[in-house]
Amino acid sequence: MLGVLKKVFDPNKRQLARLEKIADQVDALGPEMARLSDEQLRQKTEEFKARYQQGESLDDLLVEAFAVVREGAKRVLGLYPYKVQIMGGVVLHEGDIAEMKTGEGKTLTATMPVYLNALTGRGVHVVTVNEYLATRDATEMGKLYEFLGMTVGLNLSGMSREEKQAAYNADITYGTNNEFGFDYLRDNMVLYKEHIVQRPLYYAIIDEVDSILIDEARTPLIISGTAQKSTKLYVQANAFVRTLRKDVDYTYDEKTKSVQLTEEGINKAERAFGIDNLFDLKHVTLNHHIQLALRAHVTMQRDVDYVVQDGKVIIVDPFTGRLMHGRRYSDGLHQAIEAKEGLEIQNESMTLATITFQNYFRMYEKLAGMTGTAKTEEEEFRNIYNMRVVVIPTNRPVIREDRPDLIYRTMEGKFRAVVEDIAARHAKGQPVLVGTVAIETSEMLSEMLKKRGIPHNVLNAKNHAKEAEIIAQAGQKGAVTIATNMAGRGTDIKLGEGVKELGGLAVIGTERHESRRIDNQLRGRSGRQGDPGVSQFYLSLEDELMRRFGSESLMAMMDRLGMDDSQPIQSKMVTRAVESAQKRVEGNNFDARKQLLQYDDVLREQREIIYRQRYEVLDSDNLRGIIEKMIHSVIERVVNAHTPKEEVPEEWNLKGLVEYLNAHLLPEGDVTEADLRGKEPEEMIELIWAKVKARYDEKEAQIPPEQMREFERVVVLRAVDMKWMHHIDAMEQLRQGIHLRAYGQVDPLREYQMEGYAMFEEMIAAIEEEVATYIMKAEIHHNLERQEVAKGEAVHPKEDGEEPKRKPVRKAVRVGRNDPCPCGSGKKYKHCCGRTV
């Protein structure tokens, strides 16, 4: 009954019926398009663009545009997209995922929605897993787009800025997920607007979408710079600050915990470091380190604000007195305290920018993807990316035979059987593709085949171009190919002459993967386009997945039945048990990714704010308005800190306020305590603001306006980049240590959100303060240059497709207490023979 209901209410069926209607309409235009000359076909592109500009939507143009691409493909590539490919194309245009089996022509399917969306002139990105595939597709499909009058760009790592700009300005850009992500990050670190390469993100089609959005979703892209000099500076600044005297060289205000160098202290610093002006822009870093060392010595007390444990400085929560593991003071204060305590200074890992694929791809207005296997992860695509998965039927029915798993007792027995199977098939000339989970396994199998004298190829996802050639040959008579899961993705295995009669390509899996999806990918390598084929998985009770989900009872059963290593179990029940184990692992992985995304969202919101504001700085001609707002909020904060509402005006610390103004905003004597006495905080703010504005105007008058504007931009960009870099670092440290808070009955995620928000507010305040100080205090030179705060290096996540190495399980003689007893009773060792031990 359930089966009948499912058929009636199957949403995929409804989708397909709708898609089929559209495909029929496209098909009906076939003869009309065939009558057009090449020139008339090319003219269609201009006609569509004009109609789009006049207000027709892409959906209105879809049927005709798809028909044009279809006809173009026939003339240029000699390929005519099938109806199922048109259906897949519609799914992609609608921003969903088309699940199309291997060999169904995904690359050609994508050309139709790519062309349609490129008519907007906003740029379409086609994303692949490696540069070999990007180059191959851009070259092959590029012929079709160029025939239809579109421009095609290829975005590879190592290209110059000009080459990248040209690639992104094309109608259609091919590239890898890594490169698109890194370009986004680099664009938000540029010092000149003209250096930006990407246009606003509009529409992307991701090939092998499951691999990029799920398997690699948690991989962060990181651009990092190193700060080698800084460790030395912390030590030098620390030694210098030890020589200073309170009230002579610096002033300290207990209430606001603010510490300032006096004129005398500033002179001392200039003498000690042999410089003429501490507030010169070229001494920003030194000044920063001296301020940090001062704060570490004067405002931070050991065993009150922090404790030292195992050579590490750990912060004490001022409200609860708990140790805040994993939290580090930001902006280098933590390192300054380490220098003060004579500990090893943890080198700042300068992450200049970072983003995960999940968050990068969620920024596109419209996102679509295609893959052979996505249905098992449908829930994740829907929840996180708001994409549906539509299973597109194959052009010809699949006649591959998927046999139930063969389960052996030990790994040794399993591999012996695999080699026998390969040898038997090789003898009759049937091509074999063997899939392994780890590189070690493929090397071990290769050794075993060498001993038997069977010629074969081994692929380990290291050299994409060469592997594509080998994989393409894997369907020839007598070919034996061993490949790790990811090797040669995106390349078709076409059958050689006479192979069909031998039963097509045989796919042998040597172990089940954690994810059903990857097993299905391996199976799908055989039986493309209605070819015959067979797939068979060999498992053993010692495989990792089997061990994780209780293979003891099976082991005991095999022993009781007196089965040895050479006799496998082949049963649907066991196959189902394996699948349910895989479902559990997939569920766990999904939860982990979902949780990570919630943590990541905190940084994502902050990143978007910072990047948006940074772009405004690059884009605006005159920053004075923005800077005045910053200075005003600094004045408000400082006045309010020194004149708390709960104190009577006589107790207000006006001396501290004047000292702050002298150190950061105004020349000495501009505002005195007498000027401020008897005034309300609002009046003080107005008075100080008027003085600051007057000084700002004086600066403006002394130098040409364009130089002043450039000076402002240098100061703001530097402050934002520096503080943001420290902030990313502090957020990462917070995230590493936050899970320890769960012991205190608090939700780590909420804590992370609250503290992350507070740290962000602190960072904004620090940016404003630094900008205010340098605008008001620095001397302006004629040869100002914008500077990067550190040289950025893109840290590539593991090379595409390289699986994290999984060690083969080695047998040990020692029996663990919870292991099955070696006597074969089926009980745990501790309840059986282990009792007496």
UniProtKB/Swiss-Prot annotation:
One of its GO terms (molecular function) is ATP binding. The keyword Metal-binding applies. Signal peptide: none annotated. InterPro entries: Helicase_ATP-bd (IPR014001), Helicase_C-like (IPR001650), P-loop_NTPase (IPR027417), SEC_C_motif (IPR004027), SecA (IPR000185), SecA_CS (IPR020937), SecA_DEAD (IPR011115), SecA_motor_DEAD (IPR014018). It comes from the Bacteria. It holds the Pfam family SecA_PP_bind. Zn(2+) binds at C821, C823, C832, C833. Belongs to the SecA family. This is Protein translocase subunit SecA 1. It comes from Geobacillus kaustophilus (strain HTA426).
